[in-house]
Amino acid sequence: MPFYRRTVVPQRLCPRNPPQPLAELRDVSHLAALSLLRQLADLCGHSLALLEDLEGHLLALGRRTDSLYRRTVRLRRRLPCRLLGPEDDEELLAAANSGRENATATAHSRSSWRQPVNVFLSSGRPPSVEELLREAQLNLQSLLQEEYEEQYSEARLLGQTFRSSDGAPEPTPSPRPQSAKRLEFVLMPAKRQLSEDETTTQGVRAPEACLSLSTANKQSAWNDPFPLPILKERLWLQPCSTQSDLVPINISGQQFDRHASFRHSLFNTETAVNPKSTLRRRRTIIGFSNFSQRDQGHSSSPTGSLARSATSDIRPGHSAPQVVQGRVAVGQEARFPSLTSPGLRHSSSEPGDAHQARSASDHPGMESMAVVYSVPSSCNGPTESTFSTSWKGDAFTYMTPSASSQGNQVSENGKNPSSGNSWVPLNTLPPLVPKEAATLFVTRDNPAGCTGLPSYSEHPTLRRQIPERPPKIGLLARGTSRLETGPGGTNRFRERSLSVPTDSGVTSVDYDEEQKTSETRILPYASTSSEGSNSTDNIAALSTEQEARHRRQRSKSISLKKAKKKPSPPMRSVSLVKDEPALPPEGELVLPKDQRPRSLCLSLEHQGHHPPHPDAQGHPAVPMLKDPGSTQFSHHWYLTDWKSGDTYQSLSSSSTATGTTVIECTQVQGSSESLASPSTSRATTPSQLSIEVEAREVASPGRPTGLMSPSSGYSSQSETPTPTVSMSLTLGHLPPPSASVRVRPVVPERKSSLPPTSPMEKICKSRLSFDLPLTSSTTLDLSGMSISIRSKTKVSRHHSDTNFGVKLAQKTSPNQPIMPMVTQSDLRSVRLRSVSKSEPEDDIESPDYIEEPGAEEVFTMPERKVKPPIAEKPPLARRPPSLVHRPPSLPGEYPLTSPTMAMASRSSIPHMKQLPQDSYTVLRKPKSPSFPGESTASSSLVLSPLASSSGAFFSGTQQPPQASVEDGGPKVRALPERIGLQSQEEAEKKMTKIPPPVPKKPSVLYLPLTSPVAQMDACMAEPRLPFSPIITLEEDGKCPSTGDDQKSPGKGVTSPLHTDTEKEAISPGRSVEPSAEEKSLISDKTAEWIAEEEDDVFVASRTTEDLFTVIHRSKRKLLGWKETGEGFTGSKPSSHSPVKNTADSPTGEAAAAPGPSSSACLDAGRNDDFKALLQKKGSKATPRTRPSAAELLKTTNPLARRIIAQFSKDYEPTDNPST
């Protein structure tokens, strides 16, 4: 359209004098009037231009019409027979003549309107006009029907499925015969309606429509694809509920033909004829969505023919029951291709990501998925629902996506609807159906009674067919509330309500079948869920590889169903997803809550290595979970539960009431919820990722090993089985070889449940992901440390993920991944806490442990710099594992003791200070012997050239610290190769968890003096080496405590280096004396802790007794009963001989280092702390401890609170003296 070009210049219109201020109202009015006039002038110009344009068009049209008319006249003359009557002909001829004569006459004079033929008469109607009329009629009918349907749906939720828009139902004699030919149900594709000549198919000409519907000719038209008409029809009908393609039986008895064509759905012609019989009998309606068919890319005609054939099969019984059976047969056997229409999968109503993820592979199956809705009253769904209003929402009691989301998991009894299904709005479901073109089997009447419903029993067969995805008719034979979808359907539902899966109380119906069909979906979903945010990427990544795994896992998953599990809010599915990327969304959904294993499923990744874990679970479910298929879903769903909400809250809601256990499980499943989804973004640490992948393949199949013990109860030590699992999985996860045996390190799991541990674990995980490569992680696998980190991370994920995880992750995350490597960040993050408080008790129990603390100290040292205050608590829980482990590792541990002795010699910290490297070397050598014992994993980790054994163990990171730090550092590091890495990680975690006031600082301080250069060298060996100095510092801290006595002076002396190294670790105030005593404690604790983790890794069995022992020991330590004993017992005293021994006896040394108050404070603080913890005084005992993580844990978890308080006080006293 030509745009008017304004040529008038405003200044010319209203020439202005020099602008003057508008002083008067009239001036303003004048200006306004002028502007208005200008605008009007513009408008007039535009209108004039438009008019001119129109005039030109009209003239051109007139000329064209004239020429066309003349041509038509000439043509007629040439035709042998006149199309028009004589009069018309004469008129036309005359007009043509006149046109020729007046060729220049205006177009209007000769406009085509003068044509004698009446276009609207049937006789003279051209095909184009015919089509237009038909379309108009269809639109009108669709509008009318929509109105009627709404009325019916609102007024008649009852049985009237059809809301007939027009006149009374007409007996359609012809349709009946045709229905006899075809099935009773006539599927009217949209294309057919459009294609049908009778525009009245929609019901404008009801009789004709009926005839056309039933007529064979019409059928042929129907079969023929009419792409354009179909599209048009879609457009017209979409507004209508008919679009849902579920054709409710016309109960009202109104013309079914019109309805059928309108709805493009199968309907019983007989029903239309005999509304009563159909209303009574036929409750099941099979609707095929034409749109779905189109979406599928199946030509409408094939779908139509398929539907027709199916219908014909069904046709045998006019009575509703027979019809139902026939339909069932159709759905199961035929599974109309249209049901598998892509449209269903494409339906965005479902979680789009899940669908997309498996659209390619699952596409047929999903589309096939037939949603079986049991409609109690009527097939009418809510108007808003995708189902046409005909399925008024109230009518559907069917389990919606939430139940479906599990797929077959939907409970037959409708439990799902209440728990999981209720989550999915009915509206969500309807979109599913139309898009899926799923045959919507609504068993409305007495689905259970209907023989068609037996199809449910048949359904498994269908499910088995599901691999063929096309027959996706998930007929829910149970019908009433049971919504069962074909595998694809289940998956789709699963997709639809990812959060629901945990909730569904459905018993797995044909779980194996469903799993087979859903495996692929499970993988994508799991991946999505594992992501925490449903990420299509994860799904895509995992789908291929994990699909097979998920298939077998899924089948196992069935046995895992945990009916009693309390469904957590949907959010947990997201969290869970993080852990097991492959399983979470789909897998979770796959297992309804009912189906979930009673015991939480730990990832079989872990479980694979720890077969005994089932005992930890106390559930045969664990073995089942071992099945690759079952585990993923089950643990994912439970993970979702746990992770979705507060750790403890999730625990309460989760099947295992055990808060600790639940937390453990969650973390075990994915140490850092990323374990399960290594490929997904969830995997935070490369090592975890690789291990997780492996675990996913191996262990994931079963429910996570110790994840959730059905016996819940943070307090209940029986929970230890879960801890065992988490430790085994966590620790064993990384070291598959050694961890494989340790199925159930009970205590570690327990510890991981403790908030302190979890923060550290978290940190470890984060570090692994950030700083360390996957390879390092593999190295870690060899050592128990990696495992410890993982379990801790898992634990921390729930308990202190936010609080400790962030801080620790920042501090320790680089360290943790490569336990051997100690980076400066590690050193900073590592906080030497008086682990010995808690751990010395363990040590007291066995000299090994005490010695181990030396090793642990080394490990802790790298981590001591981490400030998370809560780190120590988990060590307590883990200590029993370390005890268990220690005896086996005594040779290694004793070398540690030797190193501890070396550390004791180190107690001549003065020389150590003077010759830090020399001392370090000496200590390193002692560790070297001990290291060989424990150096198996360590050697694989050999990174730094410093200590041959110890260095190897610590892969240079520890070694450099050992060399650079005091011998104690290498000793400790070298000592616990398993424990080394593991305990280092744990120490780091502890350090992070433990409040800043930790004796570790002195060691760090001392370390810097000794090994700034060595440290640098070590750092050269590995990124972690900077931390290794801190690790060494731990030992050093013991040494400095002793030799340095630097309590504060040591701090002061070491302060420069300490500030450099320990700055990272924490403030110099952490300081020598706390470093010595607390370090010994922490070292002990860490060593024990690590040993425990190692033990978990190596020694599968941890019992509640161990856990209790650890707890009691920690209590004793807190009370100070065994503080000295622990210190005496060895590794601490040996390692920190002056400080530790004096401060274990040590207290003296601790006092010496930080002043008598250090040791005394530790003992007294421990007693006070323990008492306070018992009285909840100690929960905030350590202000220096990070309240955010530790205190949160305290508040959240009584046990964690106690442990945190213990550690806090332990460190606080030391801290205060040091400070």
UniProtKB/Swiss-Prot annotation:
- Which residue stretches does the UniProt record annotate as biased composition, category Polar residues? 288-312, 526-545, 708-729, 897-908, 1131-1144
Superkingdom of origin organism: Eukaryota
Q: Which UniProt keywords apply?
A: Phosphoprotein
- Looking at the keywords, is Phosphoprotein present? yes
* Renumbered residue ranges of the record's region Disordered: 162-181, 288-321, 336-364, 400-423, 474-591, 669-741, 854-938, 979-1003, 1033-1087, 1121-1197
Q: Per its UniProt record, what PANTHER family does this chain match? A: NANCE-HORAN SYNDROME PROTEIN, NHS-LIKE PROTEIN 2
Report the protein name in the record. Answer: NHS-like protein 2
Lineage of the source organism?
A: Eukaryota, Metazoa, Chordata, Craniata, Vertebrata
